[in-house]
């Protein structure tokens, strides 16, 4: 896998999860970049990261619109999109899946499995 693909883009505003993702990415041998602006994400996604992680509740970043744009463009084929949300948000989960999110998880499950998810995307396992 080319070096440029061993990158994580994370679209979130939560400091706790920013640190958690950065730590897990480091342990998986991946670089991580935090993005808060939709336009900035589309530019950075052109570098074809392995995975883009979305806090589906970060409304300022327009996660559903971004997911649909990314999945609708052949330029981003092969980039995995993962979203997390509260376990009680069934409608948002369905909307994210319909927009093209590859994996939608409850925040607790995402947190618990983050290390394994990133290792898988880094090519370690």
Residue ranges, per PLM feature:
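Alpha4 helix (beta4-alpha4-beta5 surface) of REC/receiver domains from two-component response regulators
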Residues: 88-103
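Non-catalytic signal-transmission and effector/linker regions of two-component phosphorelay proteins
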Residues: 1-7, 22, 117-125
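Two-component/phosphorelay signaling modules centered on CheY-like receiver
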Residues: 15-33
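Conserved acidic segment of CheY-like receiver
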Residues: 6-15
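Conserved phosphotransfer microenvironments
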Residues: 54-70
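Output/docking surface of receiver
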Residues: 100-112
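His-Asp phosphorelay/catalytic-motif detector in bacterial-type signaling
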Residues: 75-80
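Acidic, metal-coordinating helix/loop segments flanking the phosphotransfer/catalytic sites
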Residues: 36-51
């Amino acid at each position: 896998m080319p070096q440029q693909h061993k990158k994580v883009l994370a679209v979130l505003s939560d400091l706790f999860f920013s640190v958690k993702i950065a730590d897990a990415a480091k342990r998986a041998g991946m670089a991580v970049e935090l993005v808060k602006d939709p336009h900035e994400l589309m530019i950075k996604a052109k570098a074809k990261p392995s995975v883009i992680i979305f806090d589906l509740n970060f409304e300022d970043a327009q996660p559903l619109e971004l997911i649909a744009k990314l999945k609708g463009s052949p330029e981003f084929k092969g980039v995995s999109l993962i979203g997390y949300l509260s376990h009680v948000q069934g409608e948002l989960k369905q909307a994210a899946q319909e927009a093209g999110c590859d994996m939608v998880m409850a925040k607790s499950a995402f947190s618990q499995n983050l290390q394994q998810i990133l290792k898988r995307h880094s090519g370690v396992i």
